[in-house]
């Protein structure tokens, strides 16, 4: 058995595995393997010339904390039935996470089929999505303020324009280009769907991608530059009232539809956990993000008697990671530069935390016990999962401490003094 990146000679085996494990149409499988699949970014378990398991590491860029960062979006997690329950996927996932680190990427994302499974690999929910269901006649009152046009490949630039404007207020959104939207148009058509752009005074100001599922108008995504454009989209949806009785709209948590329809009580607004994230390299992740925390440069202009309480804080945090042993250990977090940073206490500590529970230390026992005795006091213990939700801005330190049944200390509040962010992403592969 071998775990490695696949090659073009094994494309059919990877494709056969995908076809067996996922209920996608033949047309969609053709689309995916033509446009999205990259053998050099696909990890497999191969045995005797057969592909038993695979994980696809699809490459994306996210705008996270205002930074343009590369990441791997883990999709296509699959195993042939005869190889299930043998531990192949655990080994493959572990190896894949290390390979992501080797790409110089400090985090990964994944849309889970089961949150429990992926939490055991160090992933944590960092994105939710809002699903709105309502009677299509709830949208009757809205007015059109321009015209709609079905998107073709030539309008990919207009889609980029609308999308880039719409995500400016979100955290963690994927960065998309003309190639992405050309593929989205093709994907929607393959799935029996449509992509329409709304123009006002000749300028693109909104778009929606949707399918008509029986009598339900299902919006996969909608983005807009202003509320007037959104209301025109809602009127566009209503104009399908002879075909559809209901509408389902997938959108961001800050959607204002509840505020503008006349009777929101009869509609449903459901928050659904959507995307998980995973920190690959904790120290690098913080360097990549450059999260502003603490007083920063303003401390230098304070009176000397005030400066000691304004020059930043530090805490010691014990971090546990079930897969990437290099993340295990005790870190000193500080914000004295105005930017949140973390530094681990020595490689020996990392080695100690990476040891299996029943490891026999032999001659090393004495030095390791001395090292343990020299360790700093710990302010809090956090899992790599909890740190992902915190550093993505999905939860605050007060949230995490409350869930853990403890009170956040003043030092923790001073270190993690940033607020929750509105995280929104709507990528499927």
Which role does the model predict for each range below?
Residues 93, 98-112, 242-252:
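Conserved GNAT acetyl-CoA-binding A-motif
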Residues 102-106, 112-130, 254-271:
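Conserved active-site alpha-helix within GNAT-family acetyltransferase domains
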Residues 1-59, 66-73, 140-179, 213-218:
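Short amphipathic alpha-helix that is part of the acyltransferase structural core
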Residues 12, 147-429:
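Intrinsically disordered, low-complexity, positively biased terminal segments
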Residues 40-44, 54, 76, 193-197, ...:
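Short hydrophobic/aromatic beta-strand element in the GNAT-like acyltransferase core
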Residues 125-141:
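Flexible glycine-/small-residue-enriched beta->alpha junction loops
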Residues 77-79, 222:
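Hydrophobic adenine-recognition pocket in adenosine-nucleotide-binding enzymes
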Residues 79, 85-98, 227-238:
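Conserved acetyl-CoA-binding loop-helix of GNAT-fold acetyltransferases
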